[in-house]
């Protein structure tokens, strides 16, 4: 049976994710921007929290960890490389390590760029990838610590996951990201269609996260930096893919 996913809005535009295994009763949360909404979502479902999985060290992803750990006794797992600036870890993780929820193993992927110690969690059997602020719906995280080439390689790693994977990213930035994408390719019909779908979802108050990887591959400019059409759109037809990515990221930073 696939893991059950609940998207929990936090702060002004963050998301935490509850991941529940019905057979065992185990529940994990991925990132804890604040404890209150996560505890409310657990109580509403009468779920028992057993694990806290962290993608990176930024405060808007870990601020609620201490309170949630104290309330539930859940074990905390995060990147070994960032152990010195994460809340105290019970389990320090690196590329290829496994985390288990019930009977399903998830694989740890190192995806530096937004931060140098950023990790993602891929639960292949349930088709879920928790990407934090690396790959995001219609976008990617700012490069606060890593280089453009580093982030491009991380995005390529994530884009190689199965196309029907649900990308569970950390923020509701999708509509702004879509507006930026339209400045690059204002006449791209696939992009225009997705922009309309995003606008409709937000008008109805629905989250646009998670998104499907196939949609990101088709419309997310940060995943498409290697495509001839997008290279031409930014005037870099003969440039290396990582250089095109860097230019797209520069433009987004100034958008």
UniProtKB/Swiss-Prot annotation:
Keyword rRNA-binding: no
GO biological process, one term: methylglyoxal catabolic process to D-lactate via S-lactoyl-glutathione
Enzyme Commission number(s) from the entry: 3.1.2.6
Pfam families found in the cross-reference section: HAGH_C, Lactamase_B
Keywords tagged on the record: Hydrolase, Metal-binding, Zinc
Catalytic activity: an S-(2-hydroxyacyl)glutathione + H2O = a 2-hydroxy carboxylate + glutathione + H(+)
Pathway: Secondary metabolite metabolism; methylglyoxal degradation; (R)-lactate from methylglyoxal: step 2/2
Binding residues for Zn(2+) 2: 60-61, 133, 171
GO molecular function: hydroxyacylglutathione hydrolase activity; metal ion binding
Binding site for Zn(2+) 1: 56, 58, 114, 133
Entry cofactors: Zn(2+)
Cofactor note text: Binds 2 Zn(2+) ions per subunit.
Protein's job: Thiolesterase that catalyzes the hydrolysis of S-D-lactoyl-glutathione to form glutathione and D-lactic acid.
Subunit-structure text: Monomer.
PANTHER family per record: HYDROXYACYLGLUTATHIONE HYDROLASE (PTHR43705), HYDROXYACYLGLUTATHIONE HYDROLASE GLOB (PTHR43705:SF1)
HAMAP family: Glyoxalase_2
The family this protein is said to belong to: Belongs to the metallo-beta-lactamase superfamily. Glyoxalase II family.
NCBIfam families: GSH_gloB (TIGR03413)
Name this protein carries in UniProt: Hydroxyacylglutathione hydrolase
